Amino acid sequence: RGVCYNAKNGGYIDNVPGTWSGEGRGSFPSGGTTTFEVDDNAALVEENFNDSEYTGFRISSAHSINDDWEMLITHLDQDLSADGVFDYDPAKGDLLVSRFVEDTLDDSFSQTSLTLEGRLGKLDALYTGAYLERESEQQVDYSGYANVGAWLPYYVCNYTAYNLCGPATVSVELLDDNQRTTHEFRVSSNEVSDLPFSYTAGVFIDESILETENDYCYLGTDHPYASAGTWAAYQANNPLPGAWSREGRVRRPACRFFNDLKRTEEQTAYFAEMTFPVSDKLDLIVGARKYDLDVDYTGQSKFGYRGSNVANGRDYDVSGDHSADPL
C-alpha cells in the first residue's frame, strides 16, 4: 500500500512595515546623546506571509511468511517548508506583525519500521523496530533580544564610548540533525501453554543522537558604528580548540555566540509480568521492571569578544559529566 500527498497551507499573518533600533531598549544607552541606526523591514513586507507546504509519502508491505509468522514493513518520508510566524503583535493590530529577518523553516524526516509477529510453539513472539532520521534548518528573527540582552550594545555600538550604535537586529540560525533507533522484543504464553499461569516478558532499547547548532548573529556588528570604537574590528568566530564540533566550521563575524552540541541517549528497559488465576473472578498479577538510562553531552558554547579571536566559551567535553567538574 502506498500514498503520496502534498498540502499547501495559505498564510493569514501580515508582515507590515516597521522600524527597529536599540533606542530605549534593554541596556542600550539613554539620555539623548547616542546616535542609533534604525533598521526597517521594507524588503520583507508581505501579506499572508506565514504559508507552509507539506510533501511526503508512505509505503507499507504486509507479508504472510507462513501459517505462524507475519511481517509488516513501513516507510515514511516528509518534507516541510514554512515561512513567517504564526503569532502576531497586538500593538500592530489583529494578525499583524513586523519582522526584520526572514523567518524560514525546512524540516525533513524519514522513518523505516519493521514488525515481525508469530508463534514459537507455546510462545507468541513479537519484534518491532524503527529507524528515524530528521534534519531541520531554521532562521528566526530574534531582534526582541534587544529588549533584554544586557551585552548587545557591547557588540553593535562603538565600545567604549557608546555614542554610536548600529542596528539592534538579531537573527538565529538553527540546524538540528536527529537519529533514533528503537527495538522491542517480547514473548508471551499462548492458549496452548500448559503452565498454571500466563506471562509476558521482553526488552525495549532506544538509542538517539541529536546534533544541534544555534548561531546567534548580531547583525549590527557589520555596521561602521560597531567598529568606530577603540577596539579592532571583529574577526570570524572560531570553534573552541579540542571541543567536539559538528562540522568544525568558522562562524562569520556577525555570529558572536553559538552552541555546537551533541547529545546521545541510550535507554534499555526490561519487563516481565505473570498472571496467576486465583479463582474464576480473581487473578493475582506479579510484575517487575528494570530501566537503565545513559545520557551524554558533548560540544561547546562559544562567544567572541572584540579584538583577538580568543577561546572564550564552555567546553562540554570537559565539564559535561566527563570529569568531576560541574556543568
Residue ranges and their predicted role:
Residues 1-82, 110-111, 178-182, 190-194, ...:
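Transmembrane beta-barrel wall of Gram-negative outer-membrane proteins
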Residues 74-76, 109-136, 167-308:
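Face-selective signature of the C-terminal outer-membrane beta-barrel domain
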Residues 82, 136-137:
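Short acidic/glycine-rich loop or secondary-structure boundary segments that cap or lie
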